Swiss-Prot record:
GO MF, one annotated term: 4 iron, 4 sulfur cluster binding
Name of the protein: ATP-dependent helicase/deoxyribonuclease subunit B
Binding annotation for ATP: G8, R9, A10, G11, T12, G13, K14, S15
Protein family according to the UniProt entry: Belongs to the helicase family. AddB/RexB type 1 subfamily.
Gene from which the chain derives: addB
Residues that bind [4Fe-4S] cluster: C784, C1112, C1115, C1121
EC number: 3.1.-.-
Natural source organism: Staphylococcus aureus (strain Newman)
Length: 1158
């Protein structure tokens, strides 16, 4: 047995010497003694290619490239393997999770964490870590006996030891872990004749675990020769750049001493890898104590980008330059990263530049539709059919793939489910899921067309098919008793779903279409699923288990599944992490994300055992564990060194100033260190570089057109743009090869969000030959014509959800107050506290079950909200009693509807208006409350409108003047037109147009001592003071509040008197009768003007800006109109807000509808 060590810094030819040596042996004797090259898993393919691609090698059976586990299998083939079944990673984790659940009550520190999935994963990692470093449960138990140990540490180790011991007992004589198989491999080494004849080479490692050192020791002892290659200068200083590989060398020296053999060291000092002085100097001086600055020759670049996306776009452009101008191949280029956020950017950006690439990382299968379907199916059963997992299950399209437009059908089903609050076993209620119920979805009174009916029938059928499958699955699983039964039931359910046939069909189609990677994913998904089921049967077999526990354990197994994708082509860019990727001798290496916090990366302890506990363990038990955080932090410079020395020709470092979440980022201190090694190595700011060199952006045809669009848009906004972009536009426009899609991009340049004015015929088709509308519809048009067009022309509806909306709350208050008002005939004065509570309870019991399919009884939160609503109603009734006590006006009519043709005698007649086109305008609506007061054969009427929102409980006469607030004037006009139907006298005059704010009042106090309990209720009631406009007629003023006298301001209506008895300007909101009539008549003209504009086909995106606010803030149609402040601000409509509306209305002549003058 001989031991060789090839030692040297990066690029000094160590691996080349090894490969040359192996190849010479292969050429000299192709059938000679075995040669084994041991390398990390990530390097084996690359090293195999080095032999396969050598034209001088005509094939050989001598050499094998293996990692430690594959080497153990090779020995087992010769001497015989272990009799136990080997546990996969998933099987190990499932077993440990089940043990944790069984032993939970015995845990001391981790009892509360045991129920979480992540805990068993951490515990599995810790046990595997112990096994790698040859720590047994006995080691832990011996260590726990230390009386000086902290209680928390003692409890922690006792918990881990308990699970570890139980795990070892479960697998004893029946199963074996990957770590244990390596120990068995060590035991088998003396029996292997093949190993005794072998020359062993170990390359690509920078550190080893205890079990791996034991393997190396066995190889040295039993193999013919062992050669280990290490990237180190041999310096054992713990603060040296090469601390980590030097630590390996120290361990190898200890092994050699134990075996009483010497190490034949060969030092490599001459640099061979690097093609230029820049990279040689970078490698030699990176760890130098005294800096020797030299001129940079341009083979090292540092790029600064504003964002990570801009950074990767620039890398993609530079790769294209490498291929086109430097004649590199994609396989000559590598990208190394550390921040996981970059992986998504590679997938989203590199395909845009048609750059082939392979990311050397394993991807979890959990997000694949098939896996999402299975996990959602499990959650449906676990959660008793809750809506979220059900919808996730449906949206995977795995169980609904046989339906045409299945995604659209599922969307409709989702709308219905969210509107009706379907959950639990309500999914099984066929009465809920019928076509008639679907017809009412979001559109009251709508009659289904034949096509709509057929679509909804398909939705119902799809839902029934999926439910039948879930019920079959649930039934099969509920009949199982053992794990084997459950696994069998699960597999049979998948066959019942026809999942195997469906997946194989999809795989074949993908293969035929050349999408081999996606096809491979499907194969791995199915094989992985079967493997988990096999593991469950292997580990648990006929062990009894509850369905709930089985589904938990099964889900744990699914979490472990990962895609292992083989590169689809040899000529592609290699992408990997700086820590794990094995890329050597690339012509150009890009190191992206070189930011502080990423390189170096703060290393924090993520295992259950803390750094302090590791150190204590090593000191007391003399057992080495995995490196602590401070040791790993010292090795960050080595990680950077290894990454940047992978290139032969060029190295490009890049970083961004903003992270993926918008946070500020700083440059890596390593880049500052690198920059200090060279003169004239400047950081290239990418935006500034492109501004000076616009041609550098023109590397890829499609992406150039997108950048061209941005440049031309800037040019149109009078920004300075390089002439190169105008020249580029002409070249692209005149080229048949390049101009595809250019017209579409150019049309976006002149896009100004202009809508099309509807023609007369189309307007009538959309809106009808007469307009039947509520007041709010006209107010909506005044807010924005497009809003009206979207809601009443296109009839777009928001998805209705099973939750209480603001308008639902308003409807509840209206209905409750109507119910109570009718019960007491509007005589609020008669109410006492007992009566208020009785009537409130009656009203709520009658009305709340009708709200949103009994929504307010669906959960504890909504039942609490119901009580809050009751409290608000009780306070409101107290306020109404207070107001009624001091007013001569009596509430007479409640929730009074009006329309052109009344349906009952209680409804009022609304006079028809006519647009300028001759289209009838029929206004309909409902007046909350009409109060009347009669004196001297003259009836005065108050319009009372209940509002649950404070913002809408104010009458703004400027808005009234401009037609933005039309409700109150319309209601008063309707009442004045219907004196006979309302039972009023021949002479009827307006009293007040008033808003009543239904709310829960709040009063602020500076301290508890300021609260006067006797006055508190009175103060709360005064918060309900009516707001609006009152007729200045003295009869009306006196009747509104009988307490009015000089120097008194009413707390129930907006009226106050001065010392001389005149109306106070500050405390009164009044207008004379003639002015109110003018407002009413002007309001009619606003109706006519608005309706005429509607029928003229106006659909402009033109919101009306009032008091610096836009209606867009609360508009549901922004995603449709795409309103943009930069593009559409010129279309914002405004009004003169400085006018005095009363003076303005008095100064204009208003014609009544018969052409006379009022």
């Amino acid at each position: 047995m001989t031991l060789h060590a090839y030692l040297g810094r990066a690029g000094t030819g160590k691996s080349t010497k090894m490969l040359t040596e192996i190849k010479q042996k292969m050429k000299a004797d192709p059938l000679g003694d075995p040669i084994i090259l041991i390398a990390p898993t990530q390097s084996t393919f690359q090293l195999e290619q080095a032999f396969v691609n050598d034209p001088e090698l005509n094939g050989s059976l001598r050499t094998e490239v293996l990692h430690f586990e594959r080497l153990s299998h090779r020995i087992f083939q010769e001497v015989g393997s272990y009799s136990e079944q080997k546990l996969s990673k998933a099987a190990t984790e499932m077993m440990i999770y089940n043990i944790v659940q069984e032993q939970q009550k015995y845990l001391k520190l981790y009892q509360s964490q045991a129920k979480y999935y992540g805990f068993s994963e951490k515990l599995t990692e810790q046990i595997q870590d112990f096994k790698k470093y040859a720590v047994t449960p006995e080691h832990l138990e011996h260590f726990i006996a230390d009386k000086n140990m902290q209680t928390r540490t003692k409890n922690k180790l006792e918990d881990i030891a308990l699970i570890y011991r139980e795990f070892e007992q479960r697998i004893q004589n029946e199963f074996i872990t990957g770590e244990d198989s390596l120990q068995y491999f060590i035991d088998c080494m003396p029996k292997s004749e093949w190993l005794k004849r072998a020359d062993i080479y170990i390359d690509g490692f920078h550190n080893f675990s205890t079990i791996e050192y034991l393997i190396i020791k066995g190889l040295i002892k039993y193999a013919k020769s062992v050669t280990i290659i290490l990237t180190t200068d041999g310096n054992h200083d713990q603060f040296s750049l090469f601390r980590k590989p030097s630590e390996v060398l120290r361990h190898i020296e200890e092994i050699a001493n134990e075996l009483n053999i010497s190490i034949e060291r060969q030092y490599f000092n001459q640099l061979y890898r690097f093609n230029n002085q820049d990279l040689k100097h970078l490698e030699q001086e990176f760890d130098a104590l005294q800096i020797n600055r030299v001129a940079c020759q341009g083979h090292i670049n540092i790029l600064e980008s504003a964002t990570m996306r801009e950074e990767i776009n620039e890398i993609a452009r530079r790769i294209i330059v490498d291929i086109r101008d430097k004649q590199l191949r994609y396989q000559d280029i590598a990208i190394l990263y550390r921040d996981e956020s970059y992986a998504y950017l590679f997938d989203s950006i590199l395909p845009l530049y048609n750059i082939p690439y392979n990311i050397d990382t394993k991807r979890s299968m959990t997000h694949h539709p098939v896996m999402e379907m299975i996990r959602s199916l499990i959650e449906v059963i676990q959660s008793n059919w809750q809506v979220n997992p059900m919808l996730r299950l449906l949206k995977t399209d795995v169980l609904t793939a046989s339906y045409l437009k299945s995604a659209y059908l599922v969307d409709l089903l989702e709308n219905f489910v969210l509107e009706r609050g379907i959950y639990g076993k309500r999914w099984l209620d066929d009465e809920l899921f019928n076509v008639e119920h679907f017809s009412k979805m979001g559109r009251k009174g709508h009659k289904l067309t034949e096509d709509e009916r057929n679509t909804f029938e398909q939705v119902v059928k799809l839902k029934k098919d999926v439910i039948d499958k879930i019920l079959h699955f649930e039934k099969q699983m509920s009949q199982a008793e053992t794990v084997k039964d459950f696994a069998t039931a699960f597999y049979e359910s998948m066959e019942y779903f026809e999942l195997p046939n469906q997946l194989m069909t999809e795989r074949d189609e993908l293969d035929l279409n050349g999408n081999h990677e996606k096809a491979e994913e499907i194969d791995q998904i199915w094989n992985g699923l079967i493997q988990i089921l096999d593991d469950l049967v292997l580990v648990f077999g006929d062990e009894p288990m509850s369905m709930e526990r089985f589904l938990e354990v099964f889900d744990i197994g699914l979490e472990q599944l990962e895609f292992v994708m083989i590169p689809q082509t040899l000529d592609q860019v290699s992408i990997g992490t700086m820590d794990l990727a094995k890329v050597d001798n690339k012509q150009h290496v890009y190191l992206v994300g070189m930011n502080d916090g990423t390189m170096p990366q703060p290393v924090t302890a993520s295992s259950l055992i803390t750094d302090e506990e590791k150190k204590y363990f090593e000191q007391q038990a003399n057992v080495e564990l995995s490196p602590t955080s401070d040791i790993l932090q010292m090795d960050e410079a080595f990680v950077c060194y290894v990454a940047m020395t992978r290139a032969k020709g060029d190295v490009t470092f890049s970083y961004s100033l903003m992270g993926s979440s918008g946070d500020d980022k700083e440059i890596s201190p390593f880049l500052n260190q690198i920059q200090s090694l060279f003169n004239q190595l400047e950081i290239t700011n990418i935006p500034q570089y492109h501004e000076v060199n616009p041609l550098s952006l023109m590397q890829h045809a499609k992406q150039t057109k997108i950048t061209l669009f941005e440049a031309l848009r800037a040019w149109l906004y009078d920004e300075i743009v390089a002439d190169s972009w105008l020249d580029a536009y002409q070249v692209i426009r005149d080229s048949d090869h390049l101009n595809q899609g250019l017209d579409y991009l150019m049309s976006a340049l002149t896009f100004d969000n202009e809508t099309v004015k509807l023609g007369e015929t189309l307007s009538k088709d959309l809106y009808g030959k007469e307009i039947n509308a509520s007041v709010s519809r006209f107010e909506g048009y005044q807010q924005c014509p497009f809003k009206h067009y979207a809601s009443h022309g296109l009839k777009l509806n928001e998805r209705t959800k099973y939750e209480l909306q603001n308008f639902d709350l308003g409807d509840i208050f209206h209905s409750v107050l109507k119910y109570i008002s009718e019960r007491i005939n509007g005589d609020f004065k008669q109410l006492d506290l007992k009566k208020i509570r009785q009537l409130t309870n009656e009203a709520l019991e009658e009305i709340l079950p009708k709200v949103q399919f009994n929504l307010l009884n669906s959960s504890a939160y909504y039942r609490y909200l119901s009580r809050r609503i009751g409290a608000i109603v009780e306070t409101t009734l107290s306020a109404l009693k207070y107001q009624g006590t001091y007013s001569k006006f009596m509430p007479k009519h409640f929730e009074t509807s009006f329309r052109r043709k009344p349906r009952t005698n209680d409804e009022l007649i609304a006079q028809t208006l006519t647009t300028t086109q001759g289209i009838p305008i029929n206004i309909r609506g409902q007046i909350d409350r009409i109060d009347t007061y009669t004196k001297n054969d003259t009836s005065f009427v108050n319009i009372i409108d209940y509002k649950s929102s404070e913002g809408s409980a104010t009458l703004d006469l400027t808005k009234v003047y401009y037609g933005m607030q039309m409700q109150m004037m319309t209601y008063m006009d309707i009442v004045l037109q219907n004196k006979q139907r309302l039972g009023l006298t021949d002479i009827v005059k307006p009293g007040g147009l008033l808003y009543f704010h239904v709310h829960e009042p709040r009063i602020k106090f500076k301290s508890w001592s300021d609260i006067d309990e006797d006055k508190l209720e009175q103060d709360l009631i005064k918060k309900f003071k009516l707001s609006g406009l009152v007729n200045a007629d003295q009869t009306v003023i006196d009747a509104l509040d009988i307490r009015l006298e000089p120097k008194f301001t009413s707390d129930i209506v907006p009226v106050g008197l001065n010392k001389d008895g005149s109306l106070s300007k500050r405390g009164s909101q009044v207008a004379d009768e003639a002015t109110i009539y003018k407002f009413i008549q002007h309001n009619k003209e606003n109706f006519i003007e608005t309706a005429s504009n509607i029928m003229d086909g106006h659909t402009e995106v033109a919101p009306l800006k009032y008091k610096q606010k836009l209606p867009c803030a609360f508009c549901s149609y922004q995603s449709v109109c795409h309103v943009d402040g930069m593009i559409d601000s010129k279309r914002y409509r405004t009004v003169d807000e400085t006018i005095n509306p009363i003076e303005a209305i008095q100064n204009i002549n208003i014609n009544d509808e018969f052409g006379g003058e009022q």
